[in-house]
Amino acid sequence: MSWQDKIAQGLQRRRDAAAYRTRQVNEGANGRWLQSGERQYLNFSSNDYLGLSQNDEVIAAWQQGARRYGVGSGGSGHVTGYSQPHARLEQQLADWLGYPRALLFISGYAANQAVLTALTDADDRILADKLSHASLLEAAAHSPAQLRRFQHNQPEALQNLLIKPCQGQTLVVTEGVFSMDGDSAPLAALQQQTSAAGGWLLVDDAHGIGVHGEGGRGSCWLQGVQPELLVVTFGKAFGLSGAAVLCQEPVAEYLLQYARHLIYSTAMPPAQACALQAALRQVQQGDALRQQLQQRIRQFRTAAAHLPLQLGASKTAIQPLLVGDNQQSLIWAEQLRAAGLWVTAIRPPTVPPGSARLRITLSAAHQPEDIDRLLEVLYGLCH
């Protein structure tokens, strides 16, 4: 088989399964609205949970940072790319979340890959929730450690793995809020079991930070848990991009020595770190935004419970409507788009086979009439 045949067959498999991914060129796609071509859509696919991507203070901080520091960092943080804005942001994050240290990464994907590959050796094991994000499962699979996956959000399933002997160290991996189902992990139970077995817990709270907990401190704070490793990302509630790993002092120093994704990547622009400091202030002062988001979630769930579709058991901004069939989910997403509503159909392999869904994400930027319009069209599609 030639390279051309290999590529053609792989593409055809995705087409045959109605799982072919495409990208859409948009003029703007954050907060409440999405502009595509000549048409404006109500955006129910963004992770901009608090609408901060359009916040005037955050935008101004980026602009001011760019004027002072330029638009790039100029190198790895280990060479010339680590500046005062980076150091200030790391300290502010550490103080806010109650950890001695924070390390910045260019993305949540890079942070997860770096931590799992840097910390583990061949005699270690990683025990991961089976529905963990692709960045976690891929990193675990490529790490030198043995990977075992436990049933989603089932502490007893984790316990059955923990009681088995391990020559090295054990790292338990989960998410605070799961990105496709919107449900939350039982973090207190997972931490108790992990600690009792002498292991460490890593929580990726990409979808919880900024939204849950006192002052937006996230899922771990909400559940009274402090994992040994906390990954927070800035592409959701913070409205920007990038990530940080929160940990103890020796762990941070270890990652600075061994985390290749950190050592060999150009650091985020200082201007971005300035904008993230402004976003952090907005998150810390964002109780009204979080309350508004919770109102939108309650409004949607109250009415969506009467739809003839399975509504996920989510109390978060991620509200999945299970369709099942790949092609049907695409048809409904297109019909919603025709009605001026941007909702994404999520299909395998992103989710398990037979669980294609309309993944609806809500934002504090949405107005009550936006939710009403979405529900009106959904009722029309189902009846």
From Swiss-Prot:
Cofactor entry: pyridoxal 5'-phosphate
Binding site for pyridoxal 5'-phosphate: 108-109, 179, 207, 233
Assigned keywords, A-Z: Biotin biosynthesis, Pyridoxal phosphate, Transferase
Classification via PROSITE patterns: AA_TRANSFER_CLASS_2
EC number: 2.3.1.47
Residues modified as N6-(pyridoxal phosphate)lysine: 236
Reaction(s) this enzyme catalyzes, per UniProt: 6-carboxyhexanoyl-[ACP] + L-alanine + H(+) = (8S)-8-amino-7-oxononanoate + holo-[ACP] + CO2
GO MF annotations, alphabetized: 8-amino-7-oxononanoate synthase activity; pyridoxal phosphate binding
A GO biological-process term: biotin biosynthetic process
Pathway annotation: Cofactor biosynthesis; biotin biosynthesis
Positions annotated to bind substrate: 21, 133, 350
Keyword field contains Hydrolase: no
Cross-referenced Pfam families: Aminotran_1_2 (PF00155)
Role according to the record: Catalyzes the decarboxylative condensation of pimeloyl-[acyl-carrier protein] and L-alanine to produce 8-amino-7-oxononanoate (AON), [acyl-carrier protein], and carbon dioxide.
Assembly notes: Homodimer.
Family membership noted in the UniProt record: Belongs to the class-II pyridoxal-phosphate-dependent aminotransferase family. BioF subfamily.
Name under which the protein is recorded: 8-amino-7-oxononanoate synthase
